[in-house]
């Protein structure tokens, strides 16, 4: 049957990409349908029970700045919070949280069920409705047809998924869930460029079988950082520690003894795994000189004994998994609740997508998450939000939006994917961003929330919080610039206590704050400080902006220089063979990738700066337009 209501946007899949996509489209006022094979697994944390980390936390903050759900759900479900790289500069500081799986999933479910314009339906999707070269809906396994203006595919690891434990394998989307094999086969019929990747997960351990008394405890930060710009510590449930153990030479010997039954070493697995989250057998093989590897024992929640051993992802046979765990300190009597496994799945080459994440071949069809070759909840959520908002805009024939590399880690992510593609699961790092000094966690709202408001993603409550912070930061910065102190106003004793030396002439408070070793809170103890000292995120932002102003200004200048060519548009039907001086190889690569701007063209492997200069001159003569 054809469902009687037509939707603006259909989202296929209810993981981290799908939930953010559906929420984004619905916040923008579009009638949105989220199709999932199981409503009970919406927002499921399929692998590790954590959110954030280096680069990843930056993405979560950006999703939050645009009105997304992940950071807020983490504050509601987080059972340990830490700031990574706390002793380093603000550009690389990152928030990471352990999450209670049940509480996190419940928070996401609550947001979905209470979002106006959003409807849920439990059925796996087997096919898409096509009208020429445009998608027009989705067909479920029961033959129900839902019509829509746009469709967002967020199938995760479910497309033609195959699970491996030792030499045994079976179809599945993840442990306990069926694969989307029919949909995977149908998508291949549409001649979309497809490949295979793999990821893995460790065995889960019953905490009652662990001897924590001999292990090193790793507590969270106190006070705990807050993830969402809309969050607070009052949202956090009870906090728990993690624990640390290590592999040893006996562990490595056991693991090597299983190589002949490993699907990775026997060729049973064809897909490429994530470089930065290798399986334990891969680590033992690649780093044969290492005597030990650190393993973090992470609690899965407040109401369960289940423990996630971070660092032991594996597809080895179960007997090897058990013996390897029991060879480690504190795990001598470990009981495995769920075996570790690897999963192979289909992904589609993201170079076949526009920067809006819309397919170049099928109009109205958007892809987000692991289906694009990424790994990680955070990367998926960021893509989901971008795909959802652009599907919503496309449903009303509005032009798409995406941030540039200089505006957001989301911009870096989508540019890397659609320009360079992937040959292994893609993970975000701060090192991928050229302009990371201005792409910090702390200013994600100042970078993106005004845009989010303009796009219809940011509601009134969030907008009010943002405006109060933005205005308070601006007012305090202006006050620090215009408040002056001199030796008559600051005693030598106070000056040495706060500044480490006397005040020898007149200075603005901003100049004093810029000095190494002087922080805002201590400066505020000077009797001459004047106004009431601010605290929390506002004080942090004021201090960072003042101390790093010179570096940030230089980065802005670098961005401005790059702008000269970055956004020069290349016409969609441009004939690269017409540009004399370009080598055949460069012409072929440009014709294959079809970059939309000179900036995108410059990041294609093998396209030289000289080739970009030639292309720029040609486009200028032809009167190529610049993008907004």
Curated annotation (Swiss-Prot):
<protein>
    <recommendedName>
        <fullName>tRNA uridine 5-carboxymethylaminomethyl modification enzyme MnmG</fullName>
    </recommendedName>
</protein>
<dbReference type="InterPro" id="IPR004416">
    <property type="entry name" value="MnmG"/>
</dbReference>
<keyword id="KW-0274">FAD</keyword>
<keyword id="KW-0819">tRNA processing</keyword>
<dbReference type="GO" id="GO:0030488">
    <property type="term" value="P:tRNA methylation"/>
</dbReference>
<dbReference type="Pfam" id="PF01134">
    <property type="entry name" value="GIDA"/>
</dbReference>
<keyword id="KW-0963">Cytoplasm</keyword>
<dbReference type="InterPro" id="IPR047001">
    <property type="entry name" value="MnmG_C_subdom"/>
</dbReference>
<comment type="subunit">
    <text>Homodimer. Heterotetramer of two MnmE and two MnmG subunits.</text>
</comment>
<dbReference type="InterPro" id="IPR002218">
    <property type="entry name" value="MnmG-rel"/>
</dbReference>
<dbReference type="InterPro" id="IPR026904">
    <property type="entry name" value="MnmG_C"/>
</dbReference>
<dbReference type="GO" id="GO:0002098">
    <property type="term" value="P:tRNA wobble uridine modification"/>
</dbReference>
<dbReference type="InterPro" id="IPR036188">
    <property type="entry name" value="FAD/NAD-bd_sf"/>
</dbReference>
<comment type="function">
    <text>NAD-binding protein involved in the addition of a carboxymethylaminomethyl (cmnm) group at the wobble position (U34) of certain tRNAs, forming tRNA-cmnm(5)s(2)U34.</text>
</comment>
<comment type="similarity">
    <text>Belongs to the MnmG family.</text>
</comment>
<feature type="binding site">
    <location>
        <begin position="273"/>
        <end position="287"/>
    </location>
    <ligand>
        <name>NAD(+)</name>
    </ligand>
</feature>
<dbReference type="InterPro" id="IPR020595">
    <property type="entry name" value="MnmG-rel_CS"/>
</dbReference>
<dbReference type="InterPro" id="IPR049312">
    <property type="entry name" value="GIDA_C_N"/>
</dbReference>
<dbReference type="Pfam" id="PF21680">
    <property type="entry name" value="GIDA_C_1st"/>
</dbReference>
<dbReference type="InterPro" id="IPR040131">
    <property type="entry name" value="MnmG_N"/>
</dbReference>
<keyword id="KW-0520">NAD</keyword>
<feature type="binding site">
    <location>
        <begin position="13"/>
        <end position="18"/>
    </location>
    <ligand>
        <name>FAD</name>
    </ligand>
</feature>
<dbReference type="GO" id="GO:0050660">
    <property type="term" value="F:flavin adenine dinucleotide binding"/>
</dbReference>
<dbReference type="InterPro" id="IPR044920">
    <property type="entry name" value="MnmG_C_subdom_sf"/>
</dbReference>
<dbReference type="GO" id="GO:0005829">
    <property type="term" value="C:cytosol"/>
</dbReference>
<dbReference type="Pfam" id="PF13932">
    <property type="entry name" value="SAM_GIDA_C"/>
</dbReference>
<keyword id="KW-0285">Flavoprotein</keyword>
């Amino acid at each position: 049957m054809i469902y009687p209501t037509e939707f603006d946007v259909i989202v296929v899949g209810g993981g981290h990409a799908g939930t953010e996509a559906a929420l984004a489209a619905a916040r923008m006022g579009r009638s949105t349908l989220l199709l999932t094979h199981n409503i009970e697994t919406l927002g499921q944390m399929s692998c590790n029970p954590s959110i954030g980390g280096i680069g990843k936390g930056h993405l979560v903050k950006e999703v939050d700045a645009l009105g997304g759900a992940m950071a807020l759900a983490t504050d509601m479900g987080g059972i340990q919070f830490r700031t990574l790289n706390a002793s380093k500069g603000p550009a690389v500081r990152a928030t990471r949280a352990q999450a209670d799986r049940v509480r996190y999933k419940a928070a996401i479910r609550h947001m979905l069920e209470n979002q106006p314009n959003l409807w849920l339906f439990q059925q796996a999707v087997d096919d898409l409705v096509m009208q020429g070269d445009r998608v027009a809906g989705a067909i479920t396994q029961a033959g129900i047809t839902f019509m829509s203006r746009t469709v967002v595919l967020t199938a995760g690891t479910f497309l033609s998924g195959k699970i491996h434990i030792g030499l045994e394998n079976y179809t599945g989307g993840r442990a306990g869930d069926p694969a989307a094999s029919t949909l995977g086969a149908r998508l291949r019929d549409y001649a979309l460029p497809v490949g295979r990747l793999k990821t893995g997960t460790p065995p889960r351990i019953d905490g009652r079988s662990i001897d924590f008394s001999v292990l090193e405890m790793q507590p969270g930060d106190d006070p705990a950082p807050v993830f969402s710009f809309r969050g607070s510590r009052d949202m956090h449930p009870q906090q728990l520690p993690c624990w640390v153990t290590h592999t040893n030479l006996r562990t490595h010997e056991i693991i090597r003894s299983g190589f002949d039954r490993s699907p990775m070493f026997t060729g049973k697995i064809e897909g490429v795994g994530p470089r930065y989250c290798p399986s334990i057998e891969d680590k033992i093989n690649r780093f044969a000189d290492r005597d030990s590897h650190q393993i973090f024992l992470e609690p899965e929640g407040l109401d369960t004994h289940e423990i996630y051993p971070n660092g032991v992802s594996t597809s080895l046979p179960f007997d090897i998994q058990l013996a390897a765990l029991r060879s480690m300190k504190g795990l001598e009597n470990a009981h495995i609740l769920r075996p570790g496994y690897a999963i192979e799945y289909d992904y589609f080459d993201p170079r076949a997508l526009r920067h809006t994440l819309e397919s170049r071949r099928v109009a109205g069809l958007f892809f987000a998450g692991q289906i694009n070759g990424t790994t990680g909840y955070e990367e998926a959520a960021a893509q989901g939000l971008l795909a959802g908002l652009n599907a919503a805009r496309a449903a009303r024939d509005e032009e798409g939006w995406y941030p540039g590399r200089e505006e957001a880690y989301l911009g870096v992510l989508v540019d890397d994917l659609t320009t360079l593609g992937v040959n292994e699961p893609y993970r975000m790092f701060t090192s991928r961003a050229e302009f990371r000094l201005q792409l910090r966690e702390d200013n994600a709202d100042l970078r993106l929330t005004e845009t989010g408001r303009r796009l219809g993603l940011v509601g009134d409550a969030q907008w009010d919080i943002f405006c109060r912070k933005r205005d308070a930061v601006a007012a305090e910065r202006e006050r620090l610039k215009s408040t002056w102190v001199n030796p008559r106003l600051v005693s030598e004793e106070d000056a040495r206590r706060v500044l480490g030396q006397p005040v020898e002439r007149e200075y603005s408070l901003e100049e004093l704050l810029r000095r190494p070793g002087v922080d805002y809170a201590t400066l505020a103890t000077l009797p001459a400080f004047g106004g009431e000292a601010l605290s929390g995120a506002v004080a942090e932002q004021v201090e960072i902006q003042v101390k790093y102003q010179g570096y940030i200004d230089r980065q802005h200048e670098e961005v401005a220089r790059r702008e000269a060519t970055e956004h020069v548009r290349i016409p969609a039907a441009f004939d690269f063979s017409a540009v004399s001086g370009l080598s055949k190889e460069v012409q072929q690569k440009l014709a294959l990738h079809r970059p939309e701007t000179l900036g995108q063209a410059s990041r294609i492997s093998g396209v030289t700066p000289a080739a970009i200069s030639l292309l720029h001159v040609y486009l200028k003569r032809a009167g190529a337009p610049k993008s907004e």
